[in-house]
């Protein structure tokens, strides 16, 4: 994915973050943004990112740091709660089923993994409480990944699935590549 596309993607998801985290991420250099694949918020721990496959941290001033050190921004419970509410569009109930699976799919192909305490009633998980961390995986574009399949479906292809299993769901990016075939 190009740096411009990654910047656009990051701008789209920026609204989910608490104001402080949003500001720190906005300070990242473009090259780091283009190579970023995850953003991790863990209550009481440094804000961390995966950039070029490496775990890095953000300082209080928005600088990338490759080692644990003083001056790193520590994610607060408020950061977690603000981000979680925004990810759920301020209606946790509307995302009850997704939360039981441990993640929220986002509209742009990203997904947010949620770590929390499970709420169990009569032996069944009915929800979550006390969110302690959020891991946002940024969508990745794989150009031409569906080309090897084209020889099998040259006469046409009907793709069907249950309701809610379309392009906005996990695996959906592969469907987009199939749809772009000439």
Each predicted region: which residue ranges?
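N-terminal accessory targeting/assembly segments
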Residues: 1-108
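Short, ordered loop/turn segments at secondary-structure junctions
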Residues: 43-44, 141, 164
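N-terminal start-of-domain structural block
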Residues: 61-85, 123, 137-154, 160
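P-loop NTP-binding catalytic core
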Residues: 90-154
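Short amphipathic C-terminal alpha-helix that caps PH/PH-like domains
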Residues: 130, 174-175
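Glycine-rich phosphate-binding P-loop
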Residues: 153-174
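Post-Walker A helix-loop "phosphate-sensing" segment adjacent to the P-loop in P-loop NTPases
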Residues: 176-182
